[in-house]
């Protein structure tokens, strides 16, 4: 089997459903034979490793550990789902304190054991703030660390495809930006259905509002259906992000990236992005006045959560971030 690279990929939280799916997806896509599975729950991560061995992936060098030094040492790529999952009735924001404490430790491990890592993807919620926490603590450059945000856009795309009875791939330009949560900004003004602008499809304002709400609640709806938070879709998209960073096909769905410009300062937020072997690059979104206002509101919500983790002492005040990360 031919692999994209031989460099070490570490999967954090590998004993869980997202982590185990990431391991299998990375091997099925042929990213690298050298995969280290890390979790604090030994029976879980051991069991996942055994499952991967039983798959019989050609040339694979799968290891597992509960020791962070072993897991992070010499890692060139890392994906972390190592936080508490969302349960029914919870918002992503309900996970803020505990998961940001985990993210701070995660960033410290990167700085201590693998400062030369090339790219890191954070996918545990609230992903915008856990990723920001990890970035501050890790010392990495902003383009080296991203958070998963693509699911909101694929949910919007899926909802529109179902509405018009077309294949999902026939829906283009369906994106969400800002926060990965209840305050996400849905951008639909550039959507096309089979090449035809959405504005020409006769969709009522009421139906579009319903589609937007279903998109925002897509994760919680899945929890109600399956009794657990999503795991296959985040696993797949996170691995595709890392594949792009390894030099595979660029990842062009929105990703959470560090933004500090004239309009939005010192936050991680979903933007129009491209991930490739040189890192994550973003441009400012184009949209209607209503869409841009929704993005401003989402940014304000992200600032509020950022200020909460500052108040909790998980990260320092913004003015002091450079003391922990000279790249910010």
How would you describe each model-predicted region?
Residues 6, 31-75, 307-309, 314:
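Conserved N-terminal Rossmann-fold NAD(P) cofactor-binding segment
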Residues 15:
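Conserved glycine-rich cofactor-binding loop
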Residues 19-20:
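N-terminal Rossmann-fold NAD(P) dinucleotide-binding loop
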Residues 28-34, 139-142:
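Conserved S-adenosyl-L-methionine
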């Amino acid at each position: 089997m031919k692999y994209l690279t031989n460099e070490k990929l570490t999967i954090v939280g590998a004993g869980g459903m997202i982590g185990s799916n990431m391991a299998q997806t990375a091997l099925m896509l042929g990213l690298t034979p050298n995969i280290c599975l890390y979790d604090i729950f030994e029976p879980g991560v051991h069991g996942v490793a055994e499952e991967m061995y039983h798959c019989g992936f050609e040339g694979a060098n799968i290891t597992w550990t509960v020791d962070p030094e072993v897991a992070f040492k010499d890692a060139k790529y890392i994906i972390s789902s190592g936080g508490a999952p969302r349960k029914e009735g919870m918002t992503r924001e309900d996970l803020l304190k505990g998961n940001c404490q985990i993210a701070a430790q995660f960033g410290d491990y990167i700085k201590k054991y693998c400062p030369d890592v090339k790219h890191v993807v954070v996918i545990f919620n609230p992903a915008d703030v856990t990723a920001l926490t990890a970035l501050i603590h890790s010392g990495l450059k902003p383009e080296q660390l991203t958070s998963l945000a693509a699911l909101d856009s694929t949910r919007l795309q899926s909802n529109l495809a179902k509405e018009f009875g077309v294949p999902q791939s026939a829906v283009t330009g369906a994106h969400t930006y800002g926060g990965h949560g209840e305050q996400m900004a849905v951008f639909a003004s550039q959507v096309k259905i089979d090449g035809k602008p959405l504005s020409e499809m006769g969709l009522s304002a009421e139906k579009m509002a319903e589609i937007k709400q279903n998109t925002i609640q897509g994760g919680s709806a899945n929890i109600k259906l399956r009794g657990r938070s999503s795991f296959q879709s985040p696993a797949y998209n996170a691995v595709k992000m890392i594949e792009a960073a390894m030099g595979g096909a660029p990842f062009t769905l929105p990703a959470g990236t560090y933004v500090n410009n004239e309009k939005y300062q010192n936050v991680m937020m979903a933007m129009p992005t491209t991930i490739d072997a040189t890192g994550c690059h973003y441009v400012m979104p184009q949209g209607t006045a209503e869409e841009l206002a929704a993005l401003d509101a989402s940014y304000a919500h992200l600032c509020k959560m950022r200020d909460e983790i500052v108040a909790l002492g998980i990260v320092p005040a913004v003015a002091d971030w450079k003391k922990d990360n000279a790249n910010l």
